[in-house]
């Protein structure tokens, strides 16, 4: 028995070591660094809550980047989940070649976070890019998608929305698990297709909607590659997400103490947002009837 335990520990030890070295240690050390003035050139100097005081009272870029991040999240999540659920609903039908389309819609989720796709997206939305060439065929003037502050954030948002495949794959089995008897009962009551979708399908898959909402929101708050490669946070900070601000502070200006403080604020924002979502879920997330209906 002891040999089995030792063997088990030996197998999981690489994961435990990696967790300690690359997750737990940076997590704890960043908390202490957030109370210091540290530029990598000299030892950290404790400065109390000065980083946080400056952040909330003097740093206008902090509030600007936080506002852009919330705008990005509130634009991205509803659109992405709506697309994912809509496409999953269509792919749930038994049609010829449906397997190909399921794969095709999922691929962007695998490739979407790569630098190569971000470069391609930048070329697509450039002033002389493919999108402007396409609308030029219909007589429209070129649009400066990435140079206009009012359009740049939407252009970056579309990249995130395009990566709806992972959420779609999670929605698909949930739709397949909705009991057919529920639809039959609704049809007998004279419900339309739209009413069946809203009154039967959606309530029965709310646990999956909630899961996707939490996962996608957490990822959206931490989005970095797309905005960094496509616009670099511009123009005029219109796409300057909070993650870009953390990166620039820590690795461009080497202000590690302040960068750590910013990272902890982002962590707290995501934690509070998730906490509110979990707290409110008891009012709109429904579980199977054999578990008592609402999540208590």
Q: Language-model features: where?
A:
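A structural signal for multi-pass alpha-helical bundles of membrane permease subunits
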Residues: 3-296
């Amino acid at each position: 028995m002891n040999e089995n335990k030792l063997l088990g520990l030996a197998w999981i030890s690489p994961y435990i070591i990696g967790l300690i070295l690359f997750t737990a240690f940076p997590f704890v050390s960043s908390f202490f660094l957030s109370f210091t003035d540290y530029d990598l050139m000299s030892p950290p100097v404790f400065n109390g809550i000065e980083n946080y005081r400056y952040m909330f009272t003097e740093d206008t870029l902090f509030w600007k980047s936080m506002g852009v991040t919330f705008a990005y999240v509130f634009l991205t999540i509803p659109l992405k989940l709506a697309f994912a659920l809509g496409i999953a609903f269509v792919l749930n039908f038994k049609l010829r070649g449906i397997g190909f389309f399921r794969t095709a819609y999922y691929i962007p989720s695998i490739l979407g976070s790569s630098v190569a796709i971000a470069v391609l997206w930048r070329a697509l939305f450039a002033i002389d890019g493919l999108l402007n060439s396409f609308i030029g065929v219909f007589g429209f003037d070129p649009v400066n998608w990435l140079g206009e502050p009012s359009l740049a954030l939407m252009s970056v948002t579309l990249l995130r929305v395009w990566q709806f495949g992972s959420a779609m794959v999670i929605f698909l089995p949930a739709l397949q698990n909705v009991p057919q008897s529920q639809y039959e009962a609704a049809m007998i009551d004279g419900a339309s297709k739209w009413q069946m979708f809203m009154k039967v399908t959606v309530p029965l898959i709310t646990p999956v909607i909630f899961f996707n909402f939490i996962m996608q929101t957490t990822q959206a708050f931490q989005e970095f590659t797309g905005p960094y490669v496509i616009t670099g946070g511009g123009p005029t900070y219109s796409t300057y997400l909070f993650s870009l601000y953390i990166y620039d502070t820590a690795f461009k200006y080497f202000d590690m103490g302040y960068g750590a403080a910013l990272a902890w604020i982002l962590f707290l924002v995501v934690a509070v947002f998730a906490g509110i979502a979990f707290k409110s879920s008891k009012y709109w997330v429904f579980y199977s009837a054999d578990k008592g209906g609402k999540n208590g």
